[in-house]
């Protein structure tokens, strides 16, 4: 393995492997978040009091625009090709940054480590969201900031700021590259590597670059007639309401996901790399204090952003990848190589397990199967609401939803007493179908009242996978959905 990684084609092979392995996601149905983004994008109709119109989602407009474009060109799974390209580019960019801060050998090993992290099913090999798409921009911003300081050049600083700003259009919490640039510039000034005028020139260029994607989003909102307060709420204000909703619920599931995420960080090697770097931070500081300060700031920002996410889903681990790769390149040769081997073995074993599980037909797609069954039973003009929000089921059914929340968290935060849901059920726009994917009383004390109101106007009409109750509005004649819930 060590001799193979020493070859001059290592970076290219690692990038190709990352691309091809990520393309395996094309064989799997669209996931809940991806489906939700596509549905929001399809119905996108901005207004003064709504960024997206019919549906609410707390994600930036550039991300939804990307999903809208991909869906228009090649359907909901098109974004997975974009994700595969992003992962391949990450490998190349990570190698370039490692070459910049270390040497050619570090570049090759870091490239392999990057490929392992973006292709391990322990994090997520299939779905593509903002975290994955942002990775090459974040790492490239780090490299360009280093070039700007080394050459005292404004153009790399401008490019670094631009690339650091783009991830905020993919997920609004991805500010780690901004922190890295700020700390690096200030620390370089304090260390005497930059004069005051040079600091001002580089900082000004970086801020100008950062402003381009931010102002572009603001400009779009103004042109579309969306109030800036609504844009701010969708991106940041909603998080306070979401945190309150999460705090009111049971912490058991969150704690379990947090423990699983912590285990994933260890098994994939991410946590070990970060701990190994921080354990030797004094040595790194003596060799290059400005770089060390910037890397520590990068890692700290990533950890905080991941923690503030609140739900601790396993793909949160992607947020730590940029800091992990930079830290990996700076580790001592022997330690770096051992850790990369650990990453490769971990990714390889999980790929084998994931492949066997899928090829043998053991992988469940219950949301997909239920959605397909509903599509077969429904007639044109039917509508559907999935209680608890399963956008992957919704999109496979082919049915529109008259309820604005396609995810459970917006429902819990913005309709906590289920007032909107109950008004919908009792009103003229009541959906033809309701799938009780979660029991009605899961998150709200009004769940029993909602179930009683639904029972007055709907009848139980079969079950989805895992025994989920399907309700059909009274007076409507449709065949009973019969999902093939294999395995």
What residues fall within each predicted segment?
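Transmembrane-helix motifs of polytopic, lipid-linked glycan transferases
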Residues: 81-102, 109, 116, 140
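Membrane-interface transmembrane helices that cradle and orient dolichyl/undecaprenyl
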Residues: 139-159, 189-193, 268-285, 332
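Hydrophobic/aromatic-rich transmembrane helices and adjacent perimembrane loops
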Residues: 176, 303-337
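Membrane-lumen/periplasm interface segments of specific transmembrane helices
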Residues: 201-244
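Short periplasmic/luminal acceptor-recognition loop of GT-C membrane glycosyltransferases, typified by
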Residues: 360-445, 465-466
């Amino acid at each position: 393995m060590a001799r193979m990684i020493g070859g001059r084609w290592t970076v290219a092979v690692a990038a190709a492997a990352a691309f091809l392995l990520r393309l395996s996601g094309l064989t799997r149905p669209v996931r809940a978040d991806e489906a939700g983004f596509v549905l929001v994008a399809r119905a996108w109709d901005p207004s003064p009091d709504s960024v997206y119109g019919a549906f609410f989602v707390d994600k930036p407009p550039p991300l939804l625009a990307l999903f809208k474009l991909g869906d228009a060109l090649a359907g909901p799974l098109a974004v997975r090709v974009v994700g595969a390209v992003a992962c391949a580019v990450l490998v190349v960019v990570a190698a370039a940054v490692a070459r910049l801060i270390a040497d050619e050998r570090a570049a090759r090993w870091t490239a392999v480590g990057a490929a392992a992290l973006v292709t391990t099913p322990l994090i997520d090999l299939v779905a593509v969201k903002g975290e994955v798409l942002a990775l090459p921009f974040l790492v490239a911003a780090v490299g360009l900031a280093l070039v700007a300081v080394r050459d005292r050049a404004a153009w790399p600083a401008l490019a670094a700021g631009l690339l650091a700003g783009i991830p905020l259009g993919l997920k609004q919490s991805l500010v780690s590259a901004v922190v890295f640039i700020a700390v690096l510039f200030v620390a370089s000034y304090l260390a005497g590597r930059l004069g005051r005028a040079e600091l001002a020139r580089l900082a000004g260029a970086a801020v100008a670059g950062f402003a381009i994607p931010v102002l572009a989003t603001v400009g779009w909102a103004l042109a579309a007639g969306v109030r800036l307060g609504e844009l701010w709420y969708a991106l940041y204000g909603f998080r306070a309401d979401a945190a309150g909703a999460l705090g009111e619920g049971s912490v058991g599931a969150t704690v379990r996901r947090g423990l699983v995420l912590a285990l994933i960080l260890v098994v994939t090697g991410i946590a070990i790399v970060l701990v190994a770097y921080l354990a030797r931070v004094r040595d790194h500081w003596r060799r290059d204090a400005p770089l060390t300060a910037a890397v520590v700031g990068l890692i700290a920002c990533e950890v905080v952003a991941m923690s503030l996410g609140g739900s601790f889903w396993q793909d949160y681990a992607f947020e730590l990848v940029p800091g992990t790769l930079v830290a990996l390149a700076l580790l001592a040769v022997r330690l770096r190589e051992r850790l990369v081997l650990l990453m490769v073995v971990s990714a390889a074993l999980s790929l084998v397990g994931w492949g066997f599980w899928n090829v043998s037909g053991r992988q469940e797609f219950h949301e997909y199967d239920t959605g397909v069954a509903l599509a077969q039973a429904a007639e044109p003009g039917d509508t559907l609401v999935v209680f608890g929000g399963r956008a992957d089921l919704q999109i496979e059914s082919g049915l529109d939803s008259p309820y604005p929340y396609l995810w459970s968290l917006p429902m819990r935060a913005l309709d906590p007493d289920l007032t909107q849901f109950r008004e919908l059920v009792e009103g003229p726009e009541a959906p033809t179908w309701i799938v009780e994917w979660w029991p009605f009383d899961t998150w709200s004390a009004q769940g029993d009242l909602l179930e009683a109101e639904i029972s007055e106007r709907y009848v139980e009409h079969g079950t989805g996978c895992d025994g989920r109750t399907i309700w059909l509005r009274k007076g409507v004649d449709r065949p009973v959905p019969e999902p093939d819930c294999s395995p």
